[in-house]
Amino acid sequence: MSSNNNTNTAPANANSSHHHHHHHHHHHHHGHGGSNSTLNNPKSSLADGAHIGNYQIVKTLGEGSFGKVKLAYHTTTGQKVALKIINKKVLAKSDMQGRIEREISYLRLLRHPHIIKLYDVIKSKDEIIMVIEYAGNELFDYIVQRDKMSEQEARRFFQQIISAVEYCHRHKIVHRDLKPENLLLDEHLNVKIADFGLSNIMTDGNFLKTSCGSPNYAAPEVISGKLYAGPEVDVWSCGVILYVMLCRRLPFDDESIPVLFKNISNGVYTLPKFLSPGAAGLIKRMLIVNPLNRISIHEIMQDDWFKVDLPEYLLPPDLKPHPEEENENNDSKKDGSSPDNDEIDDNLVNILSSTMGYEKDEIYESLESSEDTPAFNEIRDAYMLIKENKSLIKDMKANKSVSDELDTFLSQSPPTFQQQSKSHQKSQVDHETAKQHARRMASAITQQRTYHQSPFMDQYKEEDSTVSILPTSLPQIHRANMLAQGSPAASKISPLVTKKSKTRWHFGIRSRSYPLDVMGEIYIALKNLGAEWAKPSEEDLWTIKLRWKYDIGNKTNTNEKIPDLMKMVIQLFQIETNNYLVDFKFDGWESSYGDDTTVSNISEDEMSTFSAYPFLHLTTKLIMELAVNSQSN
């Protein structure tokens, strides 16, 4: 391909600087391409020139939310890799250490042509070092250096991105932080997505603490600090990315973070006239504020604009055309479902035991058993994942344009030196790019500082709930959110619970009814019980703010007016596909006597002690009322 002269040596650098600040108000974490060696700490055992395992470090590429990213090469093959060094301090509490290491091993099984591969994991006392595929460029630098990107070219990138995201969602992994720095390009101009699966291992799964100050790509439910963010958040980010490729600017961009947040929360953006109706229509369906109404990845793959010139290897198994349909009918049921009605493939068992460290007889046992234990399910998942990799490879072989890249895709370990000769010439990043990179870093860092101190964020602080309302983000548990697209077998799978971890409780009541029906039921119950509520705003359809008179009974001292209107907030969350949670929250008191002065002189402690019983009492009444109604229906 003529573009082998690498997008880093851009003569277009002169004009790229004025676009750049648009896409990169964020902490630039590793288009594994920047040359930013100032971050090095010479005393560290990870200094330039140091050896880790079979790798020798060349330089630091950048620093991300998880720690430094270094360029290194394999001492015998000369193969370039990137090392992502995760300091164990940033990881969730120490009792999660085992889970995190399992989770990172699970990521080693992900094999998709458009995902950065994880070759190996090296553990030390303080760090986990991920050895990952090296890709020299960022998609967005490439966009900026082009005068304009045709819809055709943008669609090719977009198809690759969506296919990779679909693949991960199918394997219960949500990215949650898709943004330009995570979209890299290899020398064939193929997209490679970095950091899939990593948002799960950050402390408390709190996105805002860990995201690098790039709210421009974050979905409304992420910036509002909602407790649950499922596959829908990736759809939103992909919508923003498609918009940027086609329009060369961000749909949501404002110097003021509060204004930016407001625009994102209300979905306020403009579509330029020059977009084709197909592209504009797709963007509109992706940037829908309410995640329940947003298009799904699966639906995107069936969109007409998306399907133009779509290479078949990008399709998931259930969307692939089957030429030999007739005789496949009886097999097709097995295809995506459980491995037990199929011959067990010994090769797969070997791969599984070497990558994940399971005992072989443990693997055979779990594949032959129909028992539904978390440990067995985890092994079955992993087996199915590898099995599917095999069929993906078959598809890729059939696709001429892709088959020459098969070698790198297949390799469990990095490819050999010969394949690398071309890219060695690229590592000389010219001086101008480096200077620009430094400038961009500087602006990203100041940008980030203002973002974290913005007073607007303060109003979210007290809403930070320590209650975990929603399931943990283990990749295995994300299956729950994926069931809609999943195989019939998926519904048998129960989340993995490690012995140490405590049971996660759901607070509130769960429902499988349609969300609008649930809300309707709640309003009927509230009306029957004589509560009042504020009219909900368009974006708060799923939240009810209400007042409810609570009769305190024996008023000994009539002068002392005890506030008697309890305020509550009821909110509907989506826990997983077709499974919702109604959450009740105490929200203070008002007085029906019309003067709120009395409320303020009760101390907060007194207030909460005094409120616990009334709150539970009213909540119970409401739940009973809902139960009665649902039976009478």
Swiss-Prot record:
The coding gene here is SNF1
User: Would I find Endoplasmic reticulum among this entry's keywords?
Assistant: no
Region of interest: Auto-inhibitory domain (AID): 313-392
Q: Where in the cell is it found?
A: Cytoplasm; Nucleus; Nucleus membrane
Name of the protein this chain belongs to: Carbon catabolite-derepressing protein kinase
Q: Say where the protein is mainly found.
A: cytoplasm
* Domain-related comment: The regulatory domain (RS) also called auto-inhibitory domain (AID) inhibits kinase activity of the protein kinase domain (KD). The AID is sequestered by SNF4 within the AMP-activated protein kinase complex which might correspond to the activated SNF1 form. The ubiquitin-associated domain (UBA) localized within the AID dampens kinase activation, probably by restraining SNF1-SNF4 associations. Moreover, the UBA domain influences life span in a FKH1- and FKH2-dependent mechanism.
Keywords carried by this UniProt record:
ATP-binding, Carbohydrate metabolism, Cytoplasm, Isopeptide bond, Kinase, Membrane, Nucleotide-binding, Nucleus, Phosphoprotein, Serine/threonine-protein kinase, Transferase, Ubl conjugation
Ranges for region Disordered? 1-46, 317-345, 409-434
What result follows from mutating K549R? Decreases sumoylation of SNF1
- Start and end of every UBA domain? 348-389
A single GO cellular-component term on record: nucleus
Query: Which stretches make up the Protein kinase domain?
Result: 55-306
The further comment given in this record reads: Present with 589 molecules/cell in log phase SD medium.
